[in-house]
């Protein structure tokens, strides 16, 4: 029986949807990891590869059942050989870590990792990880330990925004700090304190014209000696030299989206995140993090939901591989990770 035109159309739509978010191989940990650091590098043969490191998960019990968070030092390389993508373990970080600032080096020959945290506390070390797994420490340490910050690059500069300096902090750091990766010996330069920067897990990025955006995240306050999160929707956009700053808002509060924001034309893309609607409720009943793919137009500040990711995701690296967005593992709901590495093609009209 011939297919009806409607069924043919439906099958075509399904095929397009499936190719729009083609999964890459899972990371070599079936539990998955949150808070990994990753970058797209150029291999010695000119091919784009993905280097990913660190992260954390709960290999035993869930946290609400008394489980312990375990941090990792693994360095994984994802490379396409004979038409097939495959991960392999290439080395170990000097210390297990997660939730660090990260970026590719200006030459795209290494992954820069700054700060982060592990079971012993927050970190201030900065290192460059090569595709062969070698780790080269930089003398330019952060002025203080910093984890759960936003991070992005602007030219050769790595910019780190907000975060905390210790696990029990009841206030977020209120500075952006900058390291020129082309001149790391010059050290970090920090802004004055600014309330807009005092967030953990903010959405941050820079577009292709050098304009900087920071949005969402969580402010922290003291609740009987423990940090209390306040999810924010503020969106601030600063144009290059002297062109002013605009203030706007996200449609809803949002933190911990896969990031940093990926620039394509005059859009910045983010994936998933935590809207805070279930904060303070029993984590075992959490329905899952966001699946939204959002595009922020840096000319109009319009925020569009342009698609749905195949699975919930938060606290994951967001990378650009060719014309695709890629998430590397991440959290699907509190305490639960996914090993999936998923890709989605940026629509031509948004590039």
Residue ranges and their predicted role:
Residues 1-5:
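N-terminal secretory signal peptides that target proteins for export/translocation
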């Amino acid at each position: 029986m011939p297919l009806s035109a409607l069924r043919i159309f439906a099958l075509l739509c399904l095929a397009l949807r499936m190719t729009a978010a083609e999964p890459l191989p899972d990371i070599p940990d079936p539990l998955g990891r949150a808070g990994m650091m990753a970058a797209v590098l150029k291999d010695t043969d000119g091919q784009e590869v993905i280097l990913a490191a660190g992260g954390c998960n709960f290999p035993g019990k869930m946290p609400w059942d008394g489980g312990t968070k375990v941090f990792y030092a693994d360095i994984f390389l994802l490379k396409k050989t004979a038409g097939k993508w495959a991960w392999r373990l290439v080395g170990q970080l000097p210390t297990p870590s997660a939730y660090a600032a990260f970026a590719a080096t200006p030459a795209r020959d290494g992954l820069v990792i700054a700060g982060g945290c592990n079971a012993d506390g927050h970190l201030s070390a900065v290192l460059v990880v090569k595709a062969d797994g070698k780790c080269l420490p930089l003398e330019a340490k952060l002025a203080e330990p910093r984890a759960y910050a936003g991070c992005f690059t602007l030219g050769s500069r790595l910019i780190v925004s907000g975060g905390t300096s210790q696990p029990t902090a009841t206030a977020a750091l209120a500075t952006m700090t900058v390291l020129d990766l082309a001149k790391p010996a010059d050290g970090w330069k920090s802004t004055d304190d600014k309330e807009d920067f005092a967030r953990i897990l903010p959405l941050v990025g820079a577009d292709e014209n050098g304009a900087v955006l920071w949005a969402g995240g969580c402010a922290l306050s003291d609740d009987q000696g423990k940090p209390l999160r306040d999810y924010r929707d503020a969106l601030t956009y600063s144009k290059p030299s002297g062109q002013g700053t605009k203030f706007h808002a996200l449609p809803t509060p949002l933190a911990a989206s896969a990031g940093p924001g990926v620039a394509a034309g005059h859009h910045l893309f983010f994936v998933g995140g935590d809207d805070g609607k279930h904060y303070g409720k029993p984590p075992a009943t959490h329905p899952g993090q966001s699946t939204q793919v959002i595009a922020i137009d840096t000319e109009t500040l319009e925020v569009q939901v342009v698609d749905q990711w195949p699975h919930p995701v938060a606290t994951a690296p967001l990378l650009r591989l060719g014309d695709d967005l890629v998430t590397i593992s991440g959290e699907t709901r509190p305490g639960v990770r996914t090993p999936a590495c998923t890709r989605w093609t940026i629509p031509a009209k948004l590039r």
